[in-house]
Amino acid sequence: KKVDDKFGPLEWRLPEAHAIYWASVGLEKCDPKDDLMPLRRAIYQPMLLSFHRGRLVENPFSKTYEVRCNLDAIPNTDKAYREFAEQDPEYRDHILKAHKNFLKDAIYFLYSYNRISESAKYFKEFAELYPDQALLTGDPTSTPDKIALDEFVVERVEEDIGDNSPDRVRGIVEGLLESSFYSLALDQEEEATGYAAMAVKVWKKFDSATNDDKSVQERIGLPPFQSMREEALRQFLQLADENEPLLADALRVRLGLSADAYKRTEPAPEEGDRPESSEPAAETPQNQ
């Protein structure tokens, strides 16, 4: 419990928790005059892994467990980096470099999971600690005083994909929507809402860059968001019907669809099964 309170919450069915435990035992028992950096590293590196993949989510339809982000571990991970940097002046710069990269990920993933206020908190911390450091790889102008939180997150999505061509952007939007549908089917509402909101933001950014010129819009513009959402939903449900029918049924229930909506062997869904609004909407999972 002591280790979990200080470095967690940890998922003790995953190896990172045990690595952190034994390294913390080593810190307690070693002579303070010894080089403790290997032990400190053996704590903050697994803590970073625990943040990225330290939560188990049960998929009752496939009877498997999946690893997800452990966002609740972010506060203690942040604290550990800062304390270790203070305790070890020799390796301070090394630890703070790792801390800087951790903060970028924390901002991004908190926002992606619809924990906007927490994301803003760490964005502010980054701005205070690293005001002259770029948030985006390869863009030295993306310092926190020159890029807004929303803008950083959308740019980070595109950075992760590595391309912002129309086909690639469409793939990003559809991928985010499918992630939203999957999370919603597993009752992971926070994730579902976050993915849907991100899909809207990416679509809006690309659409606003092309809709001023009709010829450009016709040539490389994206379809309306609701059309993309409906197509992504159709593809997701039809694939799930083949591979995980119980998951597909769960999503239909969460979205208020009929039991045969979007089934491959059935005719097109009735009007009541279609999204009502033509405008992007992602505030609630029911709109995903």
Which sequence ranges carry the predicted segments?
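Glycine-centered coil turns and helix-coil junctions that link the paired helices
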Residues: A106, S112-Y113, L129-D132
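Alpha-helical solenoid scaffolds that mediate protein-protein interactions
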Residues: T77-D88, E125-A134, A199, F206
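Boundary/linker segments of alpha-helical solenoid repeat arrays
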Residues: L129-F152, F206-V216
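Long C-terminal extensions of eukaryotic subunits of large macromolecular complexes
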Residues: E66, V157-N287
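Solenoid-repeat scaffolds in large eukaryotic assemblies
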Residues: E118-A120
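Structural register within alpha-helical repeat arrays
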Residues: H99, D105-A106, I172, S179
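Extended ligand-binding clefts on enzyme/binding-domain cores
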Residues: K1-N101, F109-N114
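Alpha-helical adaptor scaffolds
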Residues: F61-I74, A127, V154-P166
